[in-house]
Regions:
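Active-site-proximal loop->helix
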Residues: 6-18
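PLP-dependent aminotransferase-class I/II
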Residues: 15-57, 62-70
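Catalytic PLP-binding core of fold-type I/II PLP enzymes
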Residues: 63-85
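Conserved PLP-anchoring active-site segment centered on the Schiff-base-forming lysine
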Residues: 1-5
Length: 85
């Protein structure tokens, strides 16, 4: 997502956020299993996972509403906020 690659590290500099990019599928989605696996445990040795950021459109392609519902549903079930860029 451009929020990771092209924003001059703004999320880290201004927000104190440690982004963790995940591999994207050819259609711009993230595998739900990859999202779930990337959520850090409640352990002082890890940066706390608090947010799922998705990008829509992705290279001009609109992500399917059912995918967005599933991804944000997973995030909310795990206590994460969501951001759609």
């Amino acid at each position: 997502a451009h929020t990771y690659r092209y924003e001059a590290g703004g999320v880290a500099v201004f927000g104190g956020i440690q982004p963790q990019p995940l591999p994207q599928q050819a259609d711009g989605t993230l595998k739900l299993d990859d999202i779930a696996a990337a959520i850090k445990p409640d352990d002082e040795h890890f940066a706390r996972t608090r947010l799922l950021a998705l990008e829509n459109t992705w290279n001009g392609k609109v992500l399917a509403l059912d995918y967005l519902d599933a991804a944000t549903g997973l995030a909310h079930a795990r206590g994460l906020a969501t951001h759609l860029d």
